[in-house]
Amino acid sequence: MLDATLSTVFQPVVDLSTGEPVAYEALSRMQSGDFLIPPHRFFEDARTGGDLLELDADCWATSLATAREQGFRRAHSLLINIEPASFEAGLMLRIPPEQPVVIELTERALLARPGELLAMADAARAAGHAIAVDDLGAHAASLALLPLLDPDIVKLDMRLVQERPSADLARIMGALDAHLAGRDVVVIAEGIETDEHLVTARALGATHGQGWLYSAAMRDVPHAGRLSGVPLRSSHVTSAPLARTPYEVVSARVETKPSHRDLLVQMSVFLEARARTSGDSAVVLATFQESTNISPATFERYAELAADCGLVIAYAKGVSPALLATGARVHEIAEGDPLLEEWDIVVLTADFAAALVARESDPSHHEKGEYRFALTHERALVVEAARSLLADRA
């Protein structure tokens, strides 16, 4: 692709109540002679060839330069995609936009390196940018990951708008409604090409949309400087946890009780089984103190969880080959981390949330197996517990 030319086109994001554009999404195009190279192809070629970060930086810089030439001035009037690796590497900080933009991420970014992504999202918001989750509904895992990022904007995958109603669509609608309840989040539906698509988009809760019913992508944007921008919530409080561990998060709000390790094991098994019923929409985060606490039966259960669920992370001191062999993502607990005294399991799915947190009563007498524990199903508290595990640890 050495002789290919990179350029940017813009597709409008319209207010569904008026049909008027409020913002535009920047889309990268690559042309070699008279041949237009499909975006998925040149990105896949770059990924295979190890040039993804370089290509994404070129796309980012070209989009910002073209938007500046077109006269974009208002905050959040430009939506721009960024690869997870580029976002984590701080591309937007190295080549900063002149005004706050909407940064689009897919749920695979959370699956890849959740801790780093959450930290970068908080940094982006601190700089005035907004975070959008793109292609929501394309993969079931995104439904459980949504509350961890708590985006300002969700973009519904065009499949949800264009395909016939199904049980899967109903499940996604239910999960989306549950997440949006009480939140001032903008919902953008992609792929609106017919009046029927528009009806479906509205039924899904979309307030804004994109698609050929309104306009194809264009090179020149009329009145770019007059765009109002996507209407975001008045403020977004970043949710980086103050507490360092799940036990500290939950025990501050829920009364703790004494328990023996044997009961905690059975409660953990129950929550693990509940996670498996949700399949690839489930997130499971578990701490085991020392890897020597993990029995052969537990290794087997976590191999099954890793095969079935969207994201499974195990935390322990002394990572063993048997734990790595489960297929779960494994993170070692550092010496001195208060997590070494905890037995925790956090489960998040599209329609279920639970956090079982326990702290050893006397770590110097580990053989006694005595803990204080708390169990909560309050989703907001479970999300906070999950973020405390992911922060600086995943």
Predicted regions, residues:
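EAL-family c-di-GMP phosphodiesterase catalytic domain
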Residues: M1, Q11, L16-E20, M30-G33, ...
